[in-house]
Regions:
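Short gly/ser/thr-rich secondary-structure transition/capping motifs
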Residues: 33-39, 163-166
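C-terminal cap of thioredoxin/glutaredoxin-like
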Residues: 1-23, 56, 139-220
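Structural alpha/beta surface segment adjacent to cysteine/selenocysteine redox centers
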Residues: 49, 54-143, 148, 173-178, ...
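Residue-level signal for pocket-adjacent positions within structured domains
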Residues: 36-39, 123, 185
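Short clusters of hydrophobic/aromatic residues that line enzyme substrate/ligand-binding pockets
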Residues: 42-44, 128, 190
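Membrane-interface motif at the C-terminal end of an N-terminal transmembrane signal
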Residues: 22-35
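Short, flexible loop segments at the rims of nucleotide/cofactor-binding pockets, characterized by
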Residues: 31-33, 62, 160-161
Length: 220
């Protein structure tokens, strides 16, 4: 049986742990500053859309590839009703080339071909995702899209490119992202393609409430 003195000590110790945890989280948030929007080439839809989707994704993740197709379909069905921001969360411990893939995709974006390069990364995961040496596919994809490979190499190695990705990873950590893809749909978490589709079933109601607009069911 715990006596009163022991109970007080336990409560005090627990309180100190709580305060310390909050202090660490606040310090991390302060060091990150305000959450940064994704760059324009990873942002789709109007700023005032009723449905706001933020995705944390990894190009070497099979579930992320499946989700990319679902997102594309949702954008086609709901159009300007959705604002989508794509953010990087490469799981570098299990996908050694995913950070490089994210960097090259961003650099393709700076040359106007983010979506096309991202699609090639997803479609060819089995060719580069678990390569033992730096994948040649990164250059091959650039060549197929007529991108300037030297410029992409310089861009990929630039501190600003890597820092942007790592800041997004840190933001994901702050939101307790621990799997990909993780979505925040109007602030509500969804993990994986199945939960994305589950949340998408509510989109008609959200749009109707926002604009009195009815959209035929997507069927996904």
């Amino acid at each position: 049986m715990i006596n009163r003195k022991t109970a007080r000590l336990i409560a005090l110790y627990g309180g100190l742990i709580f305060v310390s945890t909050v202090a660490v989280l606040l310090a991390r948030q302060f060091s990150l500053g305000p959450e940064r929007p994704a760059p324009n080439f990873r942002t789709f839809g109007p700023a005032g859309a009723p449905i706001m989707i933020e995705e944390y994704s990894d190009f070497a993740c099979g579930a992320c590839r499946a989700a990319a197709g679902k997102l594309e379909e949702l954008l086609k069905v709901y159009g300007d009703g959705i604002r989508l921001q794509l953010k990087h969360y490469p799981l570098v411990n299990i996908h050694p080339w995913s950070l490089d893939a994210a960097a090259y995709a961003d650099c393709a974006g700076e040359q106007g071909k983010y979506k096309e390069y991202a699609a090639l990364l997803f479609e060819n995961q089995d060719k580069w995702g678990e390569a033992k040496e730096k994948p040649k596919e990164f250059e091959a994809f650039a060549g197929g899209l007529k991108l300037d490979w030297k410029e992409m190499q310089a861009c990929s190695a630039a501190p600003r490119t890597r820092q942007r990705i790592k800041l997004e990873m840190a933001e994901g950590d702050m939101k307790n992202v621990n799997a990909t893809p993780t979505f925040f749909i109007n602030g509500k978490r969804a993990v994986g393609p199945a939960q994305l589709v589950e949340q998408a079933r509510k989109f008609d109601g959200i749009l109707k409430a926002a604009h009195g607009r009815h959209v035929p069911p997507s069927g996904i």
